[in-house]
UniProtKB/Swiss-Prot annotation:
Protein name: DNA-directed RNA polymerase subunit Rpo2N
Class of enzymatic activity (EC top level): transferase
Native species: Methanothermobacter thermautotrophicus (strain ATCC 29096 / DSM 1053 / JCM 10044 / NBRC 100330 / Delta H)
GO molecular function: DNA binding; DNA-directed RNA polymerase activity; ribonucleoside binding
Main location: cytoplasm
Family membership noted in the UniProt record: Belongs to the RNA polymerase beta chain family.
E.C. number: 2.7.7.6
Amino acid sequence: MFWRKSMKKSAWGLVDAFFDKYDLVDHHIHSYNDFVSNRIQEIIDTSEPIELEQGKYRVETGKVSIEKPFIKEADGSKSKIYPTEARLRNLTYSAHMSLEMRLLKEGGPETEFEKVYIGELPVMLKSEICHLHGLSRKELMEKGEDPADPGGYFIVNGSERSIVTMEEIAPNKIILERIGEEDENRARAIVTSIRSGFRARISLEYRKPRKTGVFLRISFPYVPGEIPLVILLRALGLATDQEIITSISDDFNYQMIAADDIQVSLDRLNLNKKEMKELDEEDRREYLIRSAIKYIGNRVAKGMTEDYRIKRAEDVIDRYLLPHIGTEPEKRLEKATYLAEMTEMLLQVISGERRPHDKDHYTNKRLRVSGDLMEDLLRVAFTSLSRDMSYQLERSLARGKEPSVKQAVRSDVLTENLKHAIATGNWVGGRAGVSQLLDRTSYMGTLSHMRRVVSPLSRSQPHFEARDLHPTQFGKICPNETPEGPNCGLVKNLALLAKISEGSDASEVEEVIKMGVVN
């Protein structure tokens, strides 16, 4: 009996220790802090540069600075604004963002950077740029706040809005699945490749052709329909039949499937065999690669000139095919190797050597919290600001005026983009309900809302397996708290002691691997 009491006391001691260190909404606040500290600057640094009159003028950007929330009164005076005041006056609790900019003229002197106000960023309560950050219980009460309030939400036009955690399939990871009826023996390998906010879904499918056709077909953004995999591998630099076959697998049966596809696809490339015989080995390689690129060009830019078709096909391959590997032409062979490995894995599923992935396994899922979703939103909003700025500068030049960066920036473009998305929940990429009105029915209801996890799957479809409780959710997702009705199993809640880990920088991981750390 004493032993049981002792164990119970120790268990609650551990729970207390956990909450002394972590808060229930830490995942939102830490993610937003990272977004403010690192990702905003990264978005600005990686955005397309603004160039005018074919490079005669160029806008250069520097460091971004964010001030803590303040308000300008009618008499022109500035004063700090706290969340309580924003709620009572139906205001948006937001921070002023300024960006260092300068306009460079070709052949002209280098000008100094000037600070330009670019818009307002909605501030998450209790984040690093919030006035409530680091305040004691007594100070919070003096500012009209509930000291037990967790924070982690926004105030837009006086309304409290919470960004819900979104559950998605893990990016940049090969997911193998069987499709269709069992007797069809069809399978698919999918990769959701993500780089700088751009999402490219690459789907490689194996299916038996009805008459004559290829077994392996691939689809990726900006290329209509499906194209034979072997043609894409050739376009990526695996010029000869032998290179394609050996890169896919050492297994003879898999090599035969690739050989059959090569034979069928050669007819589609319209090769001039007489011309090929006269070429030396290096020129023959170039000819085969160019023919494959031409085939893709006919899909992406039908009816255009040959040079444009080739240029457009190369651009699509570099930018939209597996962008997480890289967007430079030098990365094409790496992409070919990745696709070849993906093909072998797919063929192993077809032959029964490998089991398909369980899409509902939590290893194959990732949770996107406030910082990740705000990053997507700001990237699109900043692109809109850049386009508007480019238009304003072009107008100034057309009127014969000397362009000015300060006059070209319309701060309401960025502000309205961010405010509208958080106020309505309509996010970039056509997603709805990403931000919701914070549940204030009870304190427990508020905490529950802040720890909600939402699946993007359609509510009108059965999705029995996705709605089921999966063994890998143990300790991560609450097995009990899910609504009844169409949202059952698709709207979940984090377990009490669950903590969301943050993704690390890929370059740091590569450095560790180079040092010899395997696992």
